[in-house]
């Protein structure tokens, strides 16, 4: 009888081909945050996913905590858009408000939730691109400082991580 042990030959091979275990404690749930009050709107392209106004975030936070989800990644949907995506880096923007709300909500319950903020300008710009446009192209040198301003605004609000998705 021949037993093939080549995938168990070394620690590196064993780690590489070991079973992967996924549980809620390793997952991050996306949350889309909109301006306004008392809003919970379905995201048509993502069944079971909703856009929440800040005042309704407690509902989804409770669900995440009950399921044992490790954290959330916040995506902002601004009320107004402009050419430079200024809503992304406003300290009173929808994402910084959501970060502060979630941190306070969890602290009041003696719980923790990892809060990650998406750092991208495309949702905040009137043209839908992830940066400043010059002659129809994204100008990286002009855009990077705006991404940095957004990341700093989220950090000031209390985000545990920022995640550039541009």
Q: Residue ranges of each PLM-predicted region?
A:
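Acidic, His- and aromatic-enriched active-site or binding-groove loops in soluble protein domains
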Residues: 95-100, 136-148
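Structural preference for beta-strand elements that scaffold enzyme active sites
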Residues: 26-30, 71-73, 112-116, 153, ...
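Short, acidic/polar
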Residues: 54-62, 142-152
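Alpha-helix-loop-beta-strand connector modules within alpha/beta enzyme cores
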Residues: 82-119
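Short amphipathic alpha-helices and their capping/turn segments at secondary-structure boundaries
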Residues: 12-22, 54, 58-68, 96-111
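Glycine-rich, proline-tolerant flexible connector loops at the mouths of alpha/beta enzymes
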Residues: 40-52, 67-95, 161-166
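Conserved, mostly hydrophobic/aromatic
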Residues: 31, 57, 64, 118, ...
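N-terminal small/glycine-rich loop or linker at the start of catalytic domains
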Residues: 22-49, 113-138
